[in-house]
Amino acid sequence: MPSSSSAAVLVFLLLVSLLTPTFASDSDHKYQAEEQVTLWVNKVGPYNNPQETYNYYSLPFCRPSGNNVHKWGGLGEVLGGNELIDSEIAIKFMKNVERSVICPLELDEAKVKHFKDAIESSYWFEFFMDDLPLWGFVGELHPDKNSENGKHVLYTHKNIVVKYNKDQIIHVNLTQDNPRPLEAGKKMDLTYSVQWIPTNVTFARRFDVYLDYPFFEHQIHWFSIFNSFMMVIFLTGLVSMILMRTLRNDYAKYAREDDDLESLERDVSEESGWKLVHGDVFRPASSLVLLSAVVGTGAQLALLVLLVILMAIVGTLYVGRGAIVTTFIVCYALTSFVSGYVSGGMYSRSGGKHWIKCMVLTASLFPFLCFGIGFLLNTIAIFYGSLAAIPFGTMVVVFVIWGFISFPLALLGTVVGRNWSGAPNNPCRVKTIPRPIPEKKWYLTPSVVSLMGGLLPFGSIFIEMYFVFTSFWNYKVYYVYGFMLLVFVILVIVTVCVTIVGTYFLLNAENYHWQWTSFFSAASTAVYVYLYSIYYYYVKTKMSGFFQTSFYFGYTMMFCLGLGILCGAVGYLGSNLFVRRIYRNIKCD
């Protein structure tokens, strides 16, 4: 007992340590007059390559004296490629600062080359003051008739305007001037100034200035929601027609008691379609362990996405650096019980015997896929010396969360699912000899049904994908989680409806291999999203270089894997309910 109690305490402390930096930061700090306000320098990098970021002092700016003070902002902040360092610039609350020298900068050939390379790559930097971001460019290229490439100039003065309401900082803005040409052997002073301006804006509304209302609340966004909603109405109507009309007629003919031999023979000769495969439709799927694992994982991801969206709506997670990532990781660990429960129940109902394999695969499939992609990307980031490289300590924390929270919960869920919901309950008995599957037209084959099944679900989220991609890859803050919730619900409904229709046509073609077909029919949505990401990369961005290209397609691959597993599980579970419903009332031998 003591050991289990100690483990519970350790887990609790771990979760507290992860969540506290995100939700209890300096953002609610109240300052006294002339109290020191810290300006944190964060990162620099090419503007067109959002993930290619480096330590601010990787450029030859003059560094603070002594040991650099770092700010730990939580797991999500580190995974987001942030490293906040105290600039040690003297800024005091409500005290204006005229032009003052930060430090003298002596230029040599190496420093000039470094700055010129950064300017040619449109390097930008990011600072933070009281958890509010400031951005600026390192320098710029001025046209020069004596030079083909133009004249490289470095901004040497930073003017910081701070708006405050009583004892709280509301808004910060950075402007730069005094551009100086970069020439080896010269010396220039890096200077700054601070201006404090009172404002009536409340602390609760201070982040509004960073939200792009015209972009996210454009009429095309509303139109896409309406269009997807109409698609839901159409598809639910189609499924209802199948259930209420076609199947009702089939039931009436199949269940009719008729003593007339001639009529009975005629009915038998006319009988075809889904009714003929009732003795095979509940035959266990091939690779049952894998199917159970992906369906369980997909059910967990569906619940996870719903929880994170709701928490983002209630808690405005977009305000905190890395808050979404931290919330996602912690919620993933805590919802791992769901994946085990769904997987274990499904595997038991299908008569599975390899329980250890099922438990381990369910608990580790998606995390290890992400770890594999992340390891490759991390290797690239380490080679480039980028802040995107995950520190070893952070890797240990993530592994501890998985090993001591997620993995045990998934195992527990599998055991509970096996014992509580694992009793076989098939409406029809499975025949000993499998029925041969007749040849059908090409468009009724499982591969075609699977590939076509993702088109309509992709169409329902197509516009939202543009807003999500633009937020992640083009420096916009995504805050319309109400839209995302609507789109997610629409995606689930459309996926279920499309998969049910595909399953019905497949069974009517006397093909009883519906389990994997229903999964891939829904999962193929992710294929279309990945194809769209390729279009987005070449048409909507100006990314370049091996580093950014690797991260773009690597992150997109992770996202599409999760989306595919989620949609596949939703499609399978919907089809499973449909199949059990239509075979429940027919007379099985």
Curated annotation (Swiss-Prot):
Presence of the UniProt keyword Transmembrane helix in the record: yes
Source organism (scientific name): Arabidopsis thaliana (Mouse-ear cress)
The protein's name in its UniProt record: Transmembrane 9 superfamily member 1
InterPro entries: EMP70 (IPR004240)
Domain text: The C-terminal KXD/E motif functions as a Golgi retention signal, certainly through the binding to the COP1 coatomer.
UniProt membrane topology term: Multi-pass membrane protein
Tissue/organ expression: Ubiquitous.
Chain segments annotated as transmembrane: 223-243, 294-314, 322-342, 365-385, 396-416, 449-469, 482-502, 519-539, 551-571
Location of the motif Endoplasmic reticulum export signal: 578-583
Cytoplasmic side: 244-293, 343-364, 417-448, 503-518, 572-589
Compartments, record wording: Endosome membrane; Golgi apparatus membrane
Family designation: Belongs to the nonaspanin (TM9SF) (TC 9.A.2) family.
